[in-house]
Amino acid sequence: DLRMSRGLGDVYKRQILSHDHFQGGHYEFAMAKAPIEKKWVFPGFEDVDAGIVHWPMSCIRLICADDERLVELADQILTAWRGYTDESCFVYAETDGEPHNTITPIARMRDGKFQLDLVLRNNLTTPEHPLGVYHPHAKLHHIKKENIGLIEVMGLAVLPSRLKQELFDLADLLVARAPTAGYPEALQKHAEWAQDILDRHPELNADNVHLILQDEVGHVFAEVLADAGVYKMDTAGRAGFVRFLESVK
């Protein structure tokens, strides 16, 4: 069912395609360290090293000493992606006249060459996923419900401030092995997750609970990035990614 949901979902749909800003800084994010898992040669751009980055969000990396060639190829990829549909991967360029595809670009200089990471984005929504098919899904909203921006795309979790106190309170309940049914209302959204943590960490105690929670939040954030990735890191997803690359002319 490709009927677009309304309300809050519309806010997120508009944001991903119209939220324009430039952000700079001197910090090496995890995505910048991720290797290329599959090299690719774009016809007519044999001088540009390219490939699929080993990252949960769908990222194409371009490397070239000539920045103009890099921009020329990036523009070609963006144009192709804006008009690209692959129903087998649930990728639609538009529905009901509304466009869905865009790119988040990240540029850096490394070893005397320009690098440009192009992260494929799609803001399609459905009744099942009213905030976005490629957005954190409902089971993760107790940790992260907000939109996935540039910083998160590169691997640094920007989490809601409410979590700071909630995780401290949750730590006390975990150490006490308190029944999840008795959790206060503000922590009920974490109950299922908390029980799963206890089941997998019988060693949890007052000394290690905060480290365990930090690690578990990290695992949730990895799932957030996986949800936001258009092409999943499995055989079908990577095959779909290659089909798109083949379409870039």
Where do the PLM segments sit?
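Beta-rich nucleic-acid/ligand-interaction surfaces
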Residues: 10-18, 95-102
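Sequence termini and other peripheral, non-core segments
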Residues: 112-249
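Single conserved hydrophobic/aromatic residue that forms the stacking wall/gate
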Residues: 1-8, 12
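Histidine-centered divalent-metal-coordination microenvironment in nucleic-acid enzymes
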Residues: 13-29, 119
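A conserved active-site cap/scaffold subdomain adjacent to cofactor or substrate pockets
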Residues: 51-87
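Active-site/ligand-binding surface loops and adjacent short beta/alpha elements
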Residues: 74-106
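Helical (often loop-to-helix) elements that flank the catalytic cores of nucleotide-handling enzymes
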Residues: 25-48
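Extended, composition-driven regions rather than compact fold-specific motifs
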Residues: 3, 109-111
